[in-house]
């Protein structure tokens, strides 16, 4: 039998916890409650749009029309419907034996981030707020808004809790509010083809992000954040999303007469040189999705779209997971099956052209890459073991390219093992005779060239760039691989964690990564000096952004190789 004194002690303790639970108000008098997690107040699963269900499936998000009163913002919401990320991990496992090549302390966090920790549901347009415990509404703290990656086919804000950023910002004396936003991916968020284009509902996932930013503008002051000091940042598809938010509506990032964001960080991603939303690539993706869902693709485009809207979530989830991974990561034109595309609306023109013509939001930014971005993707081309195989693969990706353009790529990226990726490893790490070559091509095509396009086109804003090499010679076959930096930002506080957290927190506060970090001075990028920070495991150095000039420039300038 539980004693009366123990019961009273437990009751007093519970009352203390409840008394500490943060309780901000929204819409004037609608009170929500969060959870105190050590030094951090957390508010998880706050709706920012109406559920995109039934007739709203595949459509742009609508403003939230419900009430927040009494919302217990204790738990993350479900993730949006998506590809099972375990499939891609299985592919990498088969190709590389991840358990053997990735250090144990990294493997668990990497798998957790990829697989996610929450269920899936079409009712998924929620966001999360993390702030220093006890922050008052008038604190006006800088706001860091995180947009997750996942190749535009998977991802969830639940995989990226903001506690580490908020705690480090407190330690630095530069406190921030951290916000993470869910958005629809795959066909639910980036369905292309004639029908969805004609309907005017392309790039729904980008609109989800925008709607989340509008919510931040309207409401973050209630949590102690400053709507006039918002930084957007993300990794991989999240960074690509940031790039497309910069060029959205031709660079108009205003809402109700005020800027939605004031600075940006792009980690391993930039503008995508895609064809428009009704071109061959999205049309193939649309038709395959419809076929896998049991819809008649020989019917009218509108009838097929209505068929897709009539299907259950589980049927569409199965359809999305019916794609061969090679369809999504390598054998659909222009590499990615889903993602932001020019539509004459939110993306009014080709992404590169928007940057080069000055039609982008004029805010300071940081953009950087991991040294070996392509190694995690190269297994999709494991069967390409000869130069003719690689040529055929490139011809399918760049379906508009001339044979001369393809041959030039092959000449700039030869089979020579010592120049492939993982870079600077000589003849080692050659999983197949063409693996390092394909990895180098993918690294520069998808990640390095978009970064340099942005840097060269944005001379009228302050910008910084970096290259991370901290896993060099530590992870066989992968090197400093795509996505590894997330482990250091959200899971493991070792090695380069301080560099990412401190530089980025300083940037959110001051639009300068160098204030109060106790780290190496990071010089701004200039066209003349091409200054670049190189992030190591325990220290950093300044270097010049001058590697693989000819190969990367070719991807920037050959119009046959981009949209």
Swiss-Prot record:
The modification Pyrrolidone carboxylic acid is found at residue 20. Disulfide bonds join 80-124, 295-307. GO terms for molecular function: triacylglycerol lipase activity. InterPro entries: AB_hydrolase_fold, CarbesteraseB, Carboxylesterase_B_AS, Carboxylesterase_B_CS, Type-B_Carboxylest/Lipase. Residues 1-19 form the signal peptide. Pfam families: COesterase. The keyword NAD does not apply. SUPFAM superfamilies: alpha/beta-Hydrolases. Keywords: Disulfide bond, Glycoprotein, Hydrolase, Lipid degradation, Lipid metabolism, Pyrrolidone carboxylic acid, Secreted, Signal. The keyword Membrane does not apply. Its EC number is 3.1.1.3. It is found in: Secreted. It catalyses: a triacylglycerol + H2O = a diacylglycerol + a fatty acid + H(+). GO terms for biological process: lipid catabolic process. GO terms for cellular component: extracellular region. CDD domains: Esterase_lipase. The active site is at 236 (acyl-ester intermediate), 373 (charge relay system), 482 (charge relay system). Glycans are attached at residues 302, 383. Belongs to the type-B carboxylesterase/lipase family. Monomer. Hydrolyzes all ester bonds in triglyceride and displays a high affinity for triolein. For unsaturated substrates having long fatty acyl chains (C18:2 cis-9, cis-12 and C18:3 cis-9, cis-12, cis-15) GCL I shows higher specific activity than GCL II, whereas GCL II shows higher specific activity against saturated substrates having short fatty acid chains (C8, C10, C12 and C14). This is Lipase 2. It comes from Geotrichum candidum (Oospora lactis).
